[in-house]
Swiss-Prot record:
Subcellular location: Cell membrane
Principal localisation: membrane
Keywords: ATP synthesis, ATP-binding, Cell membrane, CF(1), Hydrogen ion transport, Ion transport, Membrane, Nucleotide-binding, Translocase, Transport
Protein name: ATP synthase subunit beta
Species annotation: Roseiflexus castenholzii (strain DSM 13941 / HLO8)
Positions annotated to bind ATP: G153, G154, A155, G156, V157, G158, K159, T160
Membrane-protein topology: Peripheral membrane protein
Length: 471
């Protein structure tokens, strides 16, 4: 009940017990507001009703300085965050408070972060390709407009760099709105991303940052904030979708959302499930993922980085995410070790829309032929390791040579990685990607050594580099 006042009776880490009059017990997910003695405001979200007017709530910020006996006020509604055009070009925390030092948000509309997904009759399910400008993704595992894509990989194989490149490409090439949720990742990376977005420009007047909303709940924050920051970003993205826009939602990293849920679950005293995860893992994931959908008004296309603990894809966290996705981009450490970036594994990455009826016969044929050549090369690895390449048949030698060129041609200079590669980023349209790989498979560039294919845009760039070296 709004305005009801209770007393904090227990503080266990970030979990707070508060006692209210029994007939005024706050509802589940209601926000409680607690004023600390130092003048700071602390918000906690009700998670359990224990009976007798006692509720258990999880704090969204540190409980340092809190003591038993302080007042807790029921706001009568869930955490509500600002939405609308005023949020563009701003940086927020889980409560929707700006953390960029740019003053208050210019908006009058606030929405609760707990909302039901759109009704089934309002949802739209058109299968349409979403161009990213990244060759290996567009060819092998094309994104679905209004779909969900997971970028899977262990530590340090390049998930965040791909996400950053996608944000830059979308803002420049498609002039869409982006919402970025930094869930439990490094504050330094978040800071770098903000500065890069401010420097990157769509044109002389517009920065990439001006078309982006950023919401952060970083590694150093309590689990409650990391668990709810995804919902805060989702609520802001839903506003733009409901206004008829196509929105991109980036979540880095969805595994940290699961990890935060596991911490909260343990603090609330729930019995852990397999590998120590929370028993409500599937439900929590579903509540977030089902809201990421397209309606007849607009679309939300989502890209989610998924950390894979110890490179184990059978771990319950990545396995639960898999079931919600339309496309999966798998990053492989062995490819990164060869210096090929993005380190996407074209044999393990999949997309629901790699179908001749959607992408076209030519695209489908080229993608499958590329995978066939790479698979044959993989099958021959043991023979090459034991006997050497010279013992292969002429046909297999040609397959190996083309496969090694394909592997290197899948690498690409990124705009956001210019300081590492020393090369300007390249955006390759999907039509050019398909034609380039078709020409490579047809043997047009069999005479060019494989090193010329590394970190190039289209096939014409490869030919130019080769001819320049011969002068």
């Amino acid at each position: 009940m709004a305005g009801a006042t209770g007393i904090v009776t227990d503080i266990i880490g970030v979990v707070i017990n508060a006692k209210f009059p029994e007939h005024e017990t706050p509802e589940i997910y209601n926000a409680l507001e607690i004023r600390l003695e130092n003048g700071k405001r602390l918000v906690a979200e009700v998670q359990q009703q224990l009976g007798g007017g006692v509720v258990k709530a999880v704090a969204m910020s540190s409980t340092d300085g809190m003591r038993r006996g302080v007042k807790a006020i029921d706001t009568g509604r869930p955490i509500a965050v600002p939405v609308g055009p005023g949020t563009l070009g701003r940086v927020f925390d889980v409560l929707g408070d700006p953390i960029d030092g740019e003053g208050p948000v210019q908006t009058t509309e606030y929405r609760p972060i707990h909302r039901p997904p759109p009704a089934l009759e309002d949802q739209s399910t058109t299968a349409q390709i979403f161009e990213t400008g990244i060759k290996v993704i567009d060819l092998i595992a094309p994104f679905t407009r209004g779909g969900k894509t997971g970028i899977f990989g262990g530590a340090g194989v390049g998930k965040t760099v791909i996400i950053q490149e996608l944000i830059a490409n979308v803002a420049k090439e498609q002039s869409g709105y982006s919402v970025f949720a930094g869930v439990g990742e490094r504050s330094r990376e978040g800071n770098d991303l903000i500065h890069e977005m401010k420097e990157a420009r769509i044109d002389e007047k517009t920065r990439v940052f001006d078309k982006t909303v950023m919401v952060f709940g970083q590694m150093n924050e309590p689990p409650g904030a990391r668990l709810r920051v995804g919902l805060t970003a989702m609520t802001m993205a839903e506003y733009f979708r409901d206004e008829g826009r196509d929105v991109l939602l980036f979540i880095d990293n969805i595994f940290r959302f699961v990890q935060a849920g596991s911490e909260v679950s343990a603090l609330l005293g729930r019995m852990p499930s397999q590998v120590g995860y929370q028993p409500t893992l599937g439900t929590e994931m579903g509540e977030l993922q089902e809201r990421i959908t397209s309606t007849k008004k607009g679309s939300i296309t989502s890209m989610q980085a998924v950390y894979v603990p110890a490179d184990d894809y059978t771990d319950p966290a990545p396995a639960t995410v898999f079931s919600h996705l339309d496309a999966t981009i798998t990053l492989e450490r062995s490819i990164a070790a060869k210096g090929i970036y993005p380190a996407v594994d074209p044999l393990a990455s999949t997309s629901r829309i790699l179908d001749p009826n959607i992408v076209g016969e030519e695209h489908y044929r080229v993608a499958r032929e590329v995978q066939r050549v790479l698979q044959r090369y993989k099958d021959l690895q043991d023979i090459i390791a034991i006997l050497g390449v010279e013992e292969l048949s002429d046909e297999d030698k040609l397959t190996v040579a083309r496969a090694r060129k394909i592997e290197r041609f899948f690498s690409q200079p990124f705009t956001v990685a210019q300081q590492f590669t020393g090369r300007p980023g390249k955006y390759v349209p999907i039509g050019e990607t398909v034609k380039s790989f078709a020409r490579l498979l047809a043997g047009e560039v069999d005479h060019i050594p494989e090193q010329f294919f590394l970190l190039q845009g289209g096939l014409d760039d490869v030919i130019q580099a080769y001819e320049a070296s011969r002068r």
